[in-house]
Structures are given as C-alpha cells and as structure tokens.
Amino acid sequence: MSAPIVAVIGGGQLARMMQEEASALGIHLRALVEAADGSTGQVTPDAPVGAADDEAAVRAVVTGDGTDGPAGGPASVLTFEHEHQDSALLERLQAEGVSVQPTPQALTLARDKLAMRRMMSGAGLPQPAWAEIGGPQQESTEQMVDAIEAFAAEHGWPVVLKTPRGGYDGHGVLLVRSAESLRQREAAEWIASVARARAGQGDGRGAGGGGSLGGAAVTSLLVEQAIPFTRELAVLLARTPSGQVAVWPVAQTVQEDGMCAEVLAPAPGLDSAAVEEAELIGRTVAERAGVTGVLAVELFAVETFGEPTRLYVNELAMRPHNSGHWTQDGSVTSQFAQHLRAVLDLPLGATEATAHTTVMVN
C-alpha cells in the first residue's frame, strides 16, 4: 500500500513543521513553495516552486505532474498553511472531485472577517458588537465617519477598525480612541482609501498601495467594540471530514505588536466553567462552519472578581496556528501531526498535555 500524499500550498514555517511530522507518520508531503530555498523547500524533497494564485502550479501539485518515482501521482488531499487562497480555484478543484480540506466554503470564514462575524451572529456565539462600514448608504468619507461615530455612540470609545480581508500579525487592525482621532492620520487615510475604492478611484489598499490595510483590495471596513479584556485565550482543536473532534487544553496567549509572543498551556488559573465554554465555542464553530483540519479560535477573556468569566470570539484560523506550537513538546499529539491526520480523515491522536504547564516563546 502506497503512502498517502498530502499536497500543501505554502512554503513557510508551518508547512516545514508539517513535513517533519509527515515523515514520522509515513505520509508524503508535496508542498507548493514560494522559493526553493525557503523554510519548507529546505527540508521537503517534493517542493515545486509556484504561487498560490497560479492555477497551473496548484493543479500540478495536486496531480503530481512533473513528480517522478513512488511519490508521483495525485494527492489524497489538498490543504494549506495560510488562508490567503484563490477561492474560485479551490471551488473548481472541489467540483472536479479533489478533496480540499478545509473546504473553500469553510476557509472563507477565516479569510473574510465580515463573513465570520455573520456566521457567529447566526450561531449565537459571544463576540464583540460589530458593524460593516462602507455599505450602500455609506459611499463617502463623511458618511463612513458618521457611521463609525454612531456605532461608538452606542457601544463606546475606543473602537477597532479592521480590514475584512488580508490582515495578519497586527496588519489590517487599527484602534481608534476618539472621534477626533477618527479624522486624523491613519484612521482618516483608511477611510479615505476605502471611499476612493468605492468610487472606482483605487483599490483601497491604503496609502502608497498596501501598507497597514494589509495589502488586500478593500471596499469596506469592519468596526468592532473594543473589549477591555483581562487576557487572551486560544482554543485549539481538530476535526475530520467524518466529524471526529479532538480538543487541546485551552491556552493563554500573550500578544506583542499584534503577534503571538508567548503561550502558556493550560491557561493558568482559568476557571472550569470558562474552560468548558471555550471548548464549546470551538466545537460549535467547527461544526457550524464544517471545519476540517486544525482550527484555532482566538478569544478575549474578561475576568472580574466574583463574576463569571466572559468570553468573546476575536478571530479564527483554519490551519496550524502560533498559539498551538506548544503542542510539539507539551502534548501527546502535535498540531502538525493532527492536521495531517484530520485532513486525511484518519483517527485523531490524543490531545492531553504531557506536563503540568508548558510555556512557548515565539
């Protein structure tokens, strides 16, 4: 029996760590990488070079065209190390019978924060108050400013502006503290850039193209209530196409400049009711969205003495995640091995912690 072949789009550190686990599991990893000497290309024998939006390159990594020897032939499944994929291409492959995991439909919720918020609302999950800015009645800069001010009048300052797509590691997120700051500097440029895009005078990528708007074409913004959180948590789980779910202990994350700097697992001092709620939120998201592979749900926790802990969903990731790196040495099964198991619909590994506390520094 030949080894299963997992095709993965992306050549960064996450795909590299998938390769290490694939070798141990007897799985062949075929990675579409951005550079042959990049993080994944250095350690993966089968690593054709190409872009995630190059249809010919993506099809080749799925079919195995150009791959010789026992590793040739079509992949058992196509997966990813990042969410920034061509949805239309993935849907075409899916319609042709390719197993795409997570599915393009689920992946949309990780790529598009507005779609995610709508799904959360429909599922009744706890999240910050939010609104779309740049709708049909909000074409001009002043109309968008008025809409943000009206949102803040209801939910309070500060508010958080986000680009629906393209943001990562702190990019595409802006804290706005007052009505005055909304008309100054970066916030004003964000809003003006979106207004220009809606008027057909640009693509909304921000000042100078790209920049803090995250590098993606932006024709609307997401405004959210700023949650005065005590700490940030992450619930990490994996789900197979057949519906098996395995959840790791809830972890605490420490963010610096929008990036995960430290993780403590299990989250120290988190009460059992909050742990149960966090796990239920993760399971509900996975079931509601039909997630396959690893899912990370980032949460804000508001802890007040004598009151139940309140949790709010911040963002999602449908892939191995920085908050789960601790599982490599701190859990029976790492997130990278589990992701491979999950997308292949194999039995999931145990997720118990192997130490009282694991600390990961990113």
Regions found by a protein language model. Name each.
Residues 238-240, 300-304:
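Short beta-strand micro-motifs enriched in acidic
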Residues 1-118, 122, 134-146, 209-210:
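ATP-binding N-terminal substructure of ATP-dependent carboxylate-amine bond-forming enzymes
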Residues 243-244, 304-310:
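Short, solvent-exposed loop/turn segments that connect beta-strands within catalytic domains
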Residues 276-297, 317-362:
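Active-site "cap" helix and flanking loop/linker of ATP-utilizing ligase/carboxylase catalytic domains
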Residues 258-268, 315-328:
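Short, flexible active-site loops
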Residues 65-69, 107-234, 238-285:
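Active-site nucleotide/adenylate-binding loops and adjacent lid/helix of ATP-dependent enzymes
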Residues 246, 295, 310-315:
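Protein kinase-like catalytic core scaffold
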